[in-house]
């Protein structure tokens, strides 16, 4: 009987170890494609890329070779994620590209807040000498932390669309865009919890 009890205990222990191993593999897969890059950014406080896969799943198309990554926003170096909307032949296609850094030569540029929507700031970008360089929506996903960082999405309208024609609510309420934002935000929150 003792022999059978020992075997039973060993069998149960082996099963528990197996379950733990499976669980850890599943946890590793959660957020796969995002988490490695986000963790790197959080620890090093530097620019990082996020997988383009979520954008592909939502039907986003890669316009050129330099539009294959997303960039996290950082207040210190004024970088942001860009989702750029182009209009061609009456058909719109959305691409993702790295943020532009205006640099010192563009110090005359300013962002004018044109409203708040769903807890996010909405900006319109103006160029020097009152000429409109671009129109954008910047949606802030998280509050600035003790690291002085804020995650945001910058929607940049640079061709075929005037600022006055921009319907912010319609764009922000679009199903694909909201799904993209919620997926991205959950990933950031998961990563922040792990690094605490």
Regions found by a protein language model. Give the residues of each.
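Post-signal peptide N-terminal segment of mature Sec-exported envelope proteins
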Residues: 31-53
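Short, hydrophobic/aromatic-rich segments at coil-to-beta transitions
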Residues: 33-41, 66-70, 114-124
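Secretory pathway targeting signatures of secreted, lumenal, and periplasmic proteins
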Residues: 46-101, 129-132
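C-terminal motif of bacterial Sec signal peptides marking the signal peptidase cleavage site
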Residues: 18-21
């Amino acid at each position: 009987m003792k022999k059978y009890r020992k075997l039973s205990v060993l069998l149960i222990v082996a099963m528990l170890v197996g379950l733990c191993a499976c669980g850890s593999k599943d946890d590793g897969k959660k957020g796969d494609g995002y988490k490695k890059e986000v963790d790197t950014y959080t620890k090093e406080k530097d620019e990082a890329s996020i997988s383009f896969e979520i954008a592909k799943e939502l039907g986003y198309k890669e316009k050129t070779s330099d539009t294959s990554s997303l960039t996290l926003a950082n207040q210190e170096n004024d970088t942001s994620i860009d989702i750029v909307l182009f209009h061609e032949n009456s058909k719109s296609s959305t691409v993702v590209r790295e943020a532009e850094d205006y640099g010192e030569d563009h110090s005359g540029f300013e962002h004018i807040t044109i409203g708040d929507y769903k807890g996010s700031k909405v900006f319109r970008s103006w160029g020097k000498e009152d000429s409109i360089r671009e129109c954008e929506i910047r949606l802030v996903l998280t509050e600035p932390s003790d690291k002085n960082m804020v995650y945001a999405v910058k929607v940049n309208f640079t061709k075929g669309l005037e600022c006055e024609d921009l319907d912010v609510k319609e764009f922000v309420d679009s199903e694909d865009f909201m799904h993209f934002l919620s997926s991205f935000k959950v990933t950031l929150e998961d990563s922040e919890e792990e690094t605490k």
